[in-house]
């Protein structure tokens, strides 16, 4: 009995819809235009507020004075460079424990190549002599284990027929 009632209710719901979207007026074009207008005004207001905050920050930045008691101060390089030498006036090297740095007049930022010395060492690349061990094809297949080498030696390579 329950199955008959359930089956009848399912068929009635499929054939006779209870509500439609038209009954609420959601497909009315006037309502869509109204909602589009509201979203457009909302977007314009948000864009105006964002631009006001963005451009007012750059004008307010000099108003903040950096003091000694402030927790976070902006980096002020002043007359220092990005890679400045520490303790420049005394010429001490912090990597050597503060000992004075020896200045070598020949030591520059870049050393030039000395072609005459380089030419002697690399003027000619010598060739190593060929090593021949065992049969003639050992040079092709190096590093074979003894079992694999025996199998290789037992097989004879045949020449390919000409094309």
From Swiss-Prot:
Q: Name the residues that span the membrane.
A: 31-51
Say which domain of life the source belongs to: Eukaryota
Name the segments for region: Disordered.
83-111
Instruction: Write out the GO cellular component annotations.
Output: alpha-beta T cell receptor complex; Fc-gamma receptor III complex
Q: Where in the cell is it found?
A: Cell membrane
Signal peptide start-end: 1-21
Give one GO term, molecular function aspect. Answer: transmembrane signaling receptor activity
Q: Which Pfam families match?
A: ITAM (PF02189), TCR_zetazeta (PF11628)
The record's section on InterPro entries has: CD3_zeta/IgE_Fc_rcpt_gamma (IPR021663), Phos_immunorcpt_sig_ITAM (IPR003110), T-cell_CD3_zeta (IPR024128)
A GO biological process of this protein is:
T cell receptor signaling pathway
**Residue ranges, compositional bias (Basic and acidic residues):** 83-98
Instruction: Identify residues that carry Phosphoserine.
Output: 58
Q: Which residues carry this modification: Phosphotyrosine?
A: 64, 72, 83, 110, 122, 141, 152
Domain ITAM: start-end pairs: 61-89, 99-127, 130-158
- Stored PROSITE patterns: ITAM_1
Cytoplasmic-facing ranges: 52-163
The domain comment in this protein's record states: The ITAM domains mediate interaction with SHB.
User: Which family is it part of?
Assistant: Belongs to the CD3Z/FCER1G family.
Could you tell me what this protein is called?
T-cell surface glycoprotein CD3 zeta chain
């Amino acid at each position: 009995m329950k199955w008959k009632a359930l089956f009848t209710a399912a068929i009635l719901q499929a054939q006779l819809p209870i509500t439609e979207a038209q009954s609420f007026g959601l497909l009315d074009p006037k309502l869509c235009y109204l909602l589009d207008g509201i979203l457009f005004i909302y977007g314009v207001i948000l864009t105006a507020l964002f631009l006001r905050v963005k451009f007012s920050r750059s004008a307010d930045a000099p108003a903040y004075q950096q003091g000694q008691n402030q927790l976070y101060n902006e980096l002020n390089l002043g007359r220092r460079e990005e890679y400045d030498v520490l303790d420049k006036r005394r010429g001490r090297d912090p990597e050597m424990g503060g000992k004075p740095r020896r200045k070598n007049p020949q030591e520059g930022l870049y050393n030039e190549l000395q072609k005459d010395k380089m030419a002697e060492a690399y003027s000619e690349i010598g060739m190593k002599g060929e090593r021949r061990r065992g049969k003639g094809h050992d040079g092709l297949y190096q590093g074979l284990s003894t079992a694999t080498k025996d199998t290789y030696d037992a097989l004879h390579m045949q020449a390919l027929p000409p094309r």
